[in-house]
Amino acid sequence: MSSPSPPAPVACAAISASEKVDGFTRKSVRKAQRQKRSQGSSQFRSQGSQAELHPLPQLKDATSNEQQELFCQKLQQCCVLFDFMDSVSDLKSKEIKRATLNELVEYVSTNRGVIVESAYSDIVKMISANIFRTLPPSDNPDFDPEEDEPTLEASWPHIQLVYEFFLRFLESPDFQPSIAKRYIDQKFVQQLLELFDSEDPRERDFLKTVLHRIYGKFLGLRAFIRKQINNIFLRFIYETEHFNGVAELLEILGSIINGFALPLKAEHKQFLMKVLIPMHTAKGLALFHAQLAYCVVQFLEKDTTLTEPVIRGLLKFWPKTCSQKEVMFLGEIEEILDVIEPTQFKKIEEPLFKQISKCVSSSHFQVAERALYFWNNEYILSLIEENIDKILPIMFASLYKISKEHWNQTIVALVYNVLKTLMEMNGKLFDDLTSSYKAERQREKKKELEREELWKKLEELQLKKALEKQNNAYNMHSIRSSTSAK
């Protein structure tokens, strides 16, 4: 049985008179109006369907025989929606609904035996009526989550209480999933997941907790929830490149992954490699990278054999033009190295440290600094020491060159400390590499001098030929002139 459809929508705020007159209002003016408004509503109602609420008796004052019927009446009363974009309309009814929702939250939280089978339908109907709606497009088409303030839901005074009631309902000792599954089904969950695209971070925070509770209590919905999150992420990566609730969904996934049974199913491994790793290419990575990295590390703690393909995947998608992303990638690599098995480290040390060597050489000091901080990690240092014969030859040239040439003195100081540490790990190899590096530099200088000499000779030869050509031309002209004179 699917969840009931929400009631008719509530009326939207009218377009301003200035915008009616001039459809091409200057962008700066429209932006100022948006910033001033800062609230939006996705719930609308036609002007002809005004509803006035009347207060019902308090549940605590009703007899035990009357309470259940009164409880259902209050749930039905709370299905009425109001236009919060109009701050002066329906004030009395809005306050009655707010007080009723508060009473329902307290009633479900403090009383046992109130969530009976007959109430489930009205409870889910009230929740659906209030929270399920089509989210409006962003007020700001150029909305940047990292810089711009989000548009907050104007009807939050009511919606917040509905979410609180929903959570108390799910967490109640009287809650029975076997009954609730008739109403909280795949359609209900699909609508819930769509709400994660809300711009309001308060709503997404409630949704995160609600979905996590549903995942925990409804075993039959778990595979469906994972599949739908997978679909949202794939659309985000390959189609829309925009979804407000990515961080919250990843946070839920982190907890889900932590509970995966071993050995991991093929579908879970595929999700890691085909969805989570490609998500590192997203433009707004900074908004959800912490949660994404946590999910990746959770997978590696479950199955260490995934370490090699994960690191190779990160190296494949390594940022080439965004230093901020490089710093994030380096942070994630350190988190992975914190949990890596020594046997797995040997498989990826060469390609990984080639990339770290490039980062150390970066002219962007934050990238170089973040890469050099690896040498402050005791466990990573122990892995480097065990494999110094492979790692030192990869890193040496970059480190030695930076110690002489980098523009940032902080980086130079860090490099000296790293070189000192590496020298203590294997002094003989360090000396051999120093000698080889200096000899190579001498050879390069010699080749450079030879190239310069060659170019000099070529220029002289070219000049000589030009002079000869000029002389020949002059001689020919002289011969023609003398012949003409005769």
UniProtKB/Swiss-Prot annotation:
One of its GO terms (molecular function) is kinase inhibitor activity. Residues 38-51 have a biased composition (Low complexity). Keywords: Acetylation, Centromere, Chromosome, Cytoplasm, Nucleus, Phosphoprotein. InterPro entries: ARM-like, ARM-type_fold, PP2A_B56. It comes from the Eukaryota. The keyword Amino-acid biosynthesis does not apply. One of its GO terms (biological process) is negative regulation of protein localization to plasma membrane. Widely expressed with highest levels in thymus and ovary. GO terms for cellular component: centrosome; chromosome, centromeric region; cytosol; M band; nucleus; plasma membrane; protein phosphatase type 2A complex; Z disc. Signal peptide: none annotated. The keyword Oxidoreductase does not apply. The modification Phosphoserine is found at residues 41-42, 49. Its main location: cytoplasm. It is found in: Cytoplasm; Nucleus; Chromosome, Centromere. Residues 27-37 have a biased composition (Basic residues). The modification N-acetylserine is found at residue 2. Residues 22-52 are annotated as: Disordered. The B regulatory subunit might modulate substrate selectivity and catalytic activity, and might also direct the localization of the catalytic enzyme to a particular subcellular compartment. Belongs to the phosphatase 2A regulatory subunit B56 family. PANTHER family: SERINE/THREONINE PROTEIN PHOSPHATASE 2A PP2A REGULATORY SUBUNIT B (PTHR10257), SERINE_THREONINE-PROTEIN PHOSPHATASE 2A 56 KDA REGULATORY SUBUNIT ALPHA ISOFORM (PTHR10257:SF6). PP2A consists of a common heterodimeric core enzyme, composed of a 36 kDa catalytic subunit (subunit C) and a 65 kDa constant regulatory subunit (PR65 or subunit A), that associates with a variety of regulatory subunits. Proteins that associate with the core dimer include three families of regulatory subunits B (the R2/B/PR55/B55, R3/B''/PR72/PR130/PR59 and R5/B'/B56 families), the 48 kDa variable regulatory subunit, viral proteins, and cell signaling molecules. Interacts with SGO1. This is Serine/threonine-protein phosphatase 2A 56 kDa regulatory subunit alpha isoform.
